[in-house]
Amino acid sequence: MTDLHRLSIRELAEGLSQAKFSSRELTEHYLKRIAKIDPQVKSYVTVTPEQALREADAADAALKAGNATALTGIPLAHKDIFCTKGIKTTAGSKMLDNFISPYDATVVEKTKAAGLVTLGKVNMDEFAMGSTSESSYVGATSNPWALDHVPGGSSGGSAAAVAADLAPFATGTDTGGSIRQPASFCGLTGLKPTYGRVSRFGIIAYASSLDQAGPMARSAEDCAYLMNVIAGHDAKDSTSVKKEVDDYVANLNNTSVKGLRIGIPKQYFNVAGLDADVKARVEESLKKLEEMGAALVEIDLNMTEAYVPTYYLIAPAEASSNLSRYDGVRYGYRCENPADLMDLYKRSRSEGFGPEVQRRILIGTYALSAGYYDAYYVKAQKVRRLIQQDFLKAFENVDVIAAPAAPTTAYKIGASLDPVEMYLGDIYTIAVNLAGLPAINAPVGFDKDNLPVGLQLIGNYWSESQLLSIVHQYQQNTDWHTKRAAIAEENA
């Protein structure tokens, strides 16, 4: 079959279990596509064909023996922030160019245990700091919908790989929108779970109180399959929560859109910089949900103006602490011929970290410094609590909250956005991480340049099943999630 890459996860699972094709055939199909198409997209940092085919053969044996899981033999790609035993894990940084992890991240361990096949590691913004995937030391990834545009970030490689049909689904991480914004830019579905729902063990840390892993795929159904594998408590992660895990696939039709109350924050739709096409597509998608029986309720989120300053104090402060471990001594990049220990520290960090990472370390170090700690960091933590309370108050009246995932569609690679402009582009996504809430992006159409637009739905704590179910039903009544970029239509 030449069009295996067009099948959904459910169709792939059925095809494998009915022996219509083998995991080896499926894996070889994707490896061929990567070899042919990825030189244009540049989504993969490392492709692992030998390991992938070994895992595919093991999956075929398990399928024959009748001891397979629901997903045995299906390939996937991992964001290059997840530690993978024996495979390079760079986090998009020169600092970790030579780092081969001695262990697997829990998410990777779980995908292996489920019989999924690892195709390789995909590109990202350096240490997940960015919204374009341009800050990676290996260079920018292209958006499959327009190769001279960015795929978003930081999980841009994950989004581009799925959108170009170079992987059926992928793992991502989201610290301030890094799953939802690239999913929006690339026309995909991406879920950021509640903080503590998916283990962070083995994820290279950016901001530990904000980071969360999740699935990126074409549809809510595909995301649900991956969530069934990766969600759950992990004793190795102290922030992981002991809470029963839903069967996300079984629950896909369990939330009725009829009677659902969707909150429309008036502050969100009056943000300066909200593109007219984005606003129009999001409003059309809400009208569709209204036709399906949902009620649209205008709400106030009065803390909206505080999102960006609060996030860009807390996240860099945590980053400056987390990234202090990269000093050129134990692992990672080490400068040549240091004059003394201080020179080793200074030069290893100056040469190993890119400009955006250095910028955030400086902001964070400043915010945590003795004279400014109370004025900046402590104050930001207090405002963070107010942002959380703002959402909880809204959820007393509504079931979910709707917003664009990003104020614009994808920008051109190399567009000279200054850092503050880039930070303001995160306005719709960062509050979700500050509050620890779950949120999902769904593709809802295109702008005048045929670039994808995304609708974001924000849920109350632990409502991943509800969010996936709402988007699944929306996707049964629309076909935006089935649209493919021209490059994805190419055969290997």
Swiss-Prot record:
Which residues are catalytic? Answer: K79 (charge relay system), S154 (charge relay system), S178 (acyl-ester intermediate)
Single Gene Ontology BP term? translation
Per UniProt, the enzyme's principal EC class comes to ligase
Record's GO cellular component terms: glutamyl-tRNA(Gln) amidotransferase complex
Xref: Pfam families? Amidase
Reaction equations catalysed: L-glutamyl-tRNA(Gln) + L-glutamine + ATP + H2O = L-glutaminyl-tRNA(Gln) + L-glutamate + ADP + phosphate + H(+)
Q: Does the keyword Ligase apply?
A: yes
EC numbers listed for it are 6.3.5.7
Q: What does the record give under GO molecular function?
A: ATP binding; glutaminyl-tRNA synthase (glutamine-hydrolyzing) activity
Q: Which Gene3D superfamilies match?
A: Amidase signature (AS) domain
InterPro entries with a match to the protein in the record = Amidase, Amidase_CS, Amidase_dom, AS_sf, GatA
What's in the keyword line of the UniProt record?
ATP-binding, Ligase, Nucleotide-binding, Protein biosynthesis
What task does this protein carry out? Answer: Allows the formation of correctly charged Gln-tRNA(Gln) through the transamidation of misacylated Glu-tRNA(Gln) in organisms which lack glutaminyl-tRNA synthetase. The reaction takes place in the presence of glutamine and ATP through an activated gamma-phospho-Glu-tRNA(Gln).
**Protein family per UniProt:** Belongs to the amidase family. GatA subfamily.
- Self-association and partners: Heterotrimer of A, B and C subunits.
Q: What is this protein called?
A: Glutamyl-tRNA(Gln) amidotransferase subunit A
Q: Which organism is it from?
A: Acinetobacter baumannii (strain AYE)
Q: What is the lineage of its organism?
A: Bacteria, Pseudomonadati, Pseudomonadota, Gammaproteobacteria, Moraxellales
